[in-house]
Amino acid sequence: SIISNNNQQSYDYLIQYLAHAIQKAEDKPGVAIVLLSDSGCGKGTFYTLLNKIWGRSSIEVNDVKHIIGNFNAALQNNFIVFMDEALFKGNHEGMERLKNLITEKTIRVEKKYMQAYDIESFHRFFAASNSEHFAHIPIDDRRFCFYRVSNQYKQNLDYFEKIHQLIENGHQVQGFLHYLQHLDIKTFNPRSRIITQEHIDQRIKSLKGFERFWYEALQNHGFSFISTSHRLLTTDNIDWLEKPFFVATETLLLCFNQYDRQSQRYESIQSQQISKIIKKLCPDANAIKHKSQTFEKEKRGYRLPGLFRARQLFETYFGCKIDWMQITDTEIKLEIEAERIAESEQEIMLDAYHESLDET
């Protein structure tokens, strides 16, 4: 329960994952378990349990180079591979190698002064890290299952001493092993791993470029979270809760470039690219020309749906629910009223269209 942070769904998946490793060792799961927490929360103790069950066919490495580097003999004759203090943030090449190791049925092993050779792989990979951001996790990731380990017993030496005593007690481990051997996993598919809140958080932390910028805009109800001395935020309806919400393409570009300079991490974007990206992140956005008191001339831009709808569309793109910043009751009322006005405008436009058809 400590590893699963008292989440029943997470606990069930982990127990069945371990049972699968016992009962169907020849069926490589294609999913790695990643444990994240502060130091002293029990990640190492979990490996002690794994080592007690699998013994000499388990290995703990403190340097991921022993697994993803040129010389990876540690993979030979080991079934459980536990990478302690693993961190792949900024290590794109290493991450790609790890992904291949997690899924490939045959992997290449290389020892010093020996020719590389291929072995059949049934490995179960585990990783533990104290870092808040383990690695760049893409939106469509299917190889990792993340666990936020509970800090309930953080640095509690007495508690973990008792756990270690239980693990060293052969009867306790034998009982647990018997349980795993006889657990019903007929309907369990390790590839259908659960999406934990930690998995969502890792994916959010991995957003970059315009995706990251758009996410921040959705979280902050608009683009005013960007600090700038330019007349950037004087455009009509820059607060997303005002309707109808129009944002000029040049405003989006300027806002993003300002955000880009602040972050100094994301690739720059051109105005012609915005349309394609907006359609992915917010399919309901309509490209239109708009003129207002603020604009001397008509400007090209986008009429965006309500904030709630825009968030829903981003969740669809993202593939799961997101914990958005709360909106006040007053803001909710404004949003509901804005949606009502938008619907009325649509009805008026439809009526006008039908009248024009009748006239013809």
Residue spans for each PLM region:
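Phosphate-handling catalytic cores of nucleic-acid transaction enzymes
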Residues: Q8, K28-A32, L36, L49, ...
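AAA+/SF3 P-loop NTPase mechanochemical coupling elements
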Residues: F71-Q76, E110-A128
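Conserved AAA+/SF3 P-loop NTPase catalytic/coupling segment centered on the Walker-B
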Residues: F79-I102, F134-D141
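Conserved catalytic/switch belt of AAA+ P-loop NTPases
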Residues: M95-Y117
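Conserved phosphate-binding loops in nucleotide/dinucleotide-binding enzymes
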Residues: Y153-E168
